[in-house]
A protein has these predicted regions:
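Long, well-structured alpha-helical subdomains associated
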Residues: 15, 141-179
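Short pre-active-site segment immediately N-terminal to the catalytic Zn-binding motif
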Residues: 83-106, 119-123
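An active-site-proximal "capping" alpha-helix that borders the catalytic cofactor pocket
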Residues: 125-141
Length: 179
């Protein structure tokens, strides 16, 4: 079952926005999205009176609304934060990075839903790490499915690049330890 996407935004969406969100939710197992009713696209996140939140909530790119009473859980994505309107260069950069940022945000909201409602045995102080690893795992799968010719070209040398990155991180940590 596809998750319903409601567009309540006045901002002009980049093309294939809804397809991107659906492709992200297609990567995640269906059991993990059970109970999540919809994804709402809005201009800015509006504070919910049912939940205590900080004052700078309007700058958040998205928020997960858990089940409360009869209201089903849903996700809210603020397009005004993802699509910057500040300057010409920032607008271009925001448009170029929109799909991966939207995918990562949708995965993070879905991971919050999974870990808060369906996953058991995780303590409150362990949620952030568990959600981050969950997002990274499924974002990598989504990226590989969306990959073009460049990713297919670099796929054979990816283990070599990963080994090189680990070696550089180790060297950097050793230098920081010496200082």
């Amino acid at each position: 079952m596809a998750i319903k996407i409601e567009n309540k935004s006045t901002i002009k969406l980049p093309r294939k926005t809804e397809e991107t969100i659906q492709s992200v939710f297609d990567v995640v197992p269906k059991e993990h999205t059970r109970g999540l009713s919809k994804v709402v696209l809005v201009d800015r996140v509006i504070p919910d009176t049912r939940i205590q939140m900080p004052s700078n909530i309007s700058e958040l790119p998205g928020i997960y609304h858990p089940k409360m009473g009869n209201a089903q859980p849903f996700c809210e994505i603020a397009l005004g934060t993802l699509l910057s309107a500040d300057g010409w260069l920032k607008r271009i950069a925001a448009r170029l990075n929109f799909r991966p940022n939207l995918a990562y945000l949708a995965l993070s909201l879905q991971a919050q839903h999974y870990h808060l409602t369906l996953s058991h045995g995780i303590k409150k102080n362990q949620y952030e790490g568990a959600i981050r690893t969950y997002i990274d795992r499924y974002h990598k799968i989504w990226r590989e499915q969306q990959a073009g010719w460049r990713a297919k070209l670099f796929k054979p040398i990816q283990p070599l690049l990963d080994k090189w990155v680990r070696k550089l991180k180790k060297r950097y940590a050793a230098e920081q330890k010496r200082k």
